[in-house]
Amino acid sequence: MNEPSPNALSRRSLLIGTATGAALAAGGLHAAEPAAPCCAATVKTYRSADFYDADGTFLVDKAREAYYDMFRRFQYPISDKLQKEMWILDFGLNDFAHVGMAGIFWLNRQDYKYFGHEIYLLPGQMIPEHCHLATDKGAPKMESWQPRRGMIYTFGEGEPTPDLIGKIPASQREIVKSRCCTPLGIDEVGDLNRLTAWHFMVAGPEGALVTEYGTFHDMDGLRFSNPQAKL
């Protein structure tokens, strides 16, 4: 069997959220969108119910449009590549307005052990708490985060920050182990405090676009503290 490309995603579920965007771009229904003109756009708020049908099926297209609306508000270009390759996850938790994300892997080089990723979070949205373990393919992932639009609350191991615990969505607040919070504004950089540490982030009230720098990311080393969370 052929080895996957070093840039390939290693979970089929990450590809599902890209399918409609790729189909639209391939069909010529979307050209690359330039940054929107400057305006005082209103921040939209969402309920998790907005992203599921009556049977509880996650509505990826509605989630995608919510991110696109945020991109336009932030004057962030919606390129052809982004339309084709952005993936969207609710982590199987059925609480997408509060726990979920979108993203794109710009590169993931096992051969040279480096990784580039953009993280997209709606207002108040959280990535589930997780850690990265060593695998047969590489060492535990190390990472740093730099907000480009909006701001984030990064949570990691260490002395708890009681006045910011309320930023954690209620559905995850009693599950997480990481209670030391460091807010990051535009172009501030935060780091994972040690290899294999538990960590997560929560977007501020406007949402967030975050550049992540890291070492090679093998999905087989990803672990969630919430036993219900999955890719």
Describe every region a protein language model picked out.
Residues 118-138:
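Conserved short histidine dyad/triad with adjacent acidic residue
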Residues 144, 200, 205-224:
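A short hydrophobic beta-strand segment most commonly corresponding to one strand
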Residues 160-195:
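Short acidic-glycine-tyrosine-enriched beta hairpin
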Residues 34-115, 171-174, 228-230:
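A short, N-terminal "cap"/entry segment at the start of jelly-roll beta-barrel domains
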Residues 2-21:
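N-terminal secretory signal peptides and thylakoid transit peptides that target proteins
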Residues 122, 140-160:
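Glycine- and acidic-residue-biased ligand/ion/polar-headgroup-sensing regions
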Residues 128-130, 154-155, 191-192, 198-204, ...:
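Short beta-strand His + acidic residue motifs that chelate non-heme Fe in jelly-roll/DSBH
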